[in-house]
Amino acid sequence: MGIFSFFSKEKKETLDKGLSKTKENVFTKITRAIAGKSKVDDAVLDNLEEVLITSDVGVETTLKIIDRIEKRVERDKYVTTSELTGILRDEIANLLTENKTEDGDGFTLPEDKKTYVIMVVGVNGVGKTTTIGKLAYQFKKAGKKVYLGAADTFRAAAVEQLVIWSERVGVPIVKQKMGSDPASVAFDALSSAKANDADVVIIDTAGRLHNKINLMNELTKIKNVMKKVIPDAPHEILLVLDGSTGQNAFEQAKQFTAATEVNALAVTKLDGTAKGGVVIGISDQFKIPVKYIGLGEGIEDLQVFRKREFVNSLFGE
């Protein structure tokens, strides 16, 4: 089933608006890079390389893109600057890791996994709890039975914020007192969700990056305890990154992917930044699909990531 069946005009407008600063930033620079040139030559490619690096795409991914364009120019002998954006768009789309759910009808869950367990990781301040709340809203809207687990027990604000979201969305939450063992909360949340035949349970975790070994041990313990309730849990480890932090998001991705088996990304706060290029670099470098993007503060402003729509929006189509 094609993606256009599910990508409404309203969603496209939200995406275009959310990426407008990034688009303006990248396009202005590309226009400047090819000014006065009719064909793609070394000077244009050097300028384009600088554009991509300064647009937070990342050095490794940028060099990969430039190399592919160079090969295309070599093969076709003559490539005009007017063709460059089309080639660039295709190469970026090819580099983005496939999100298997992007062809589906919005926020879907695998039919063969019930109760589906999502463990959410990320540093404090990236919009982790808000992303969980918006995910819960979308799953409930899709007719799913949702449970939340407040396993970030080190920050009172994290638990309080998740309680507010559970009340706002109208889904049950499992929590314990401040300072409780996070693994114990996860165990209780999965037990309750399973006993009540929930479709999905979303577990919040602490966002502390003070020590990689501690982080790894903490997340491993939570995962091991989950498996006692649901043997193949967690099915999804979703890393939430703040798109507006640019290269800092790369560092966070590096630390969390070293600490645990992240298999999905949510990139938030893309609406207020010109650094949306970070989505391309992170997906390529870590070979992890971007599953969701945050494009605003509204409850509907979390979207399923569709790479072709993202790239088209980035290039003003």
Stretches found by the model and what they are:
Residues 206-208:
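Short glycine-rich anion-binding loops that position phosphate/pyrophosphate groups of nucleotides
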Residues 16, 20-151, 158-178, 186-194, ...:
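Primarily NTPase-proximal linker/entry elements flanking Walker-type ATP/GTP-binding cores
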Residues 2-4, 9-15, 20:
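Switch/coupling subdomain of P-loop NTPase systems
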Residues 11-16, 125, 153, 215-219, ...:
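Short acidic/polar alpha-helix capping motifs at helix-coil junctions
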Residues 161, 181-196, 211-316:
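Conserved catalytic-core segment of NTP-binding enzymes
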Residues 42, 63, 78, 82, ...:
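Non-catalytic, surface-exposed connector residues within folded enzymatic/regulatory domains
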Residues 59-61, 155, 271, 299:
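Short hydrophobic/aromatic residue motifs in ordered secondary structure
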Residues 3, 104-106, 135, 251-252, ...:
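Short beta-alpha junctions and helix-cap segments that line functional grooves
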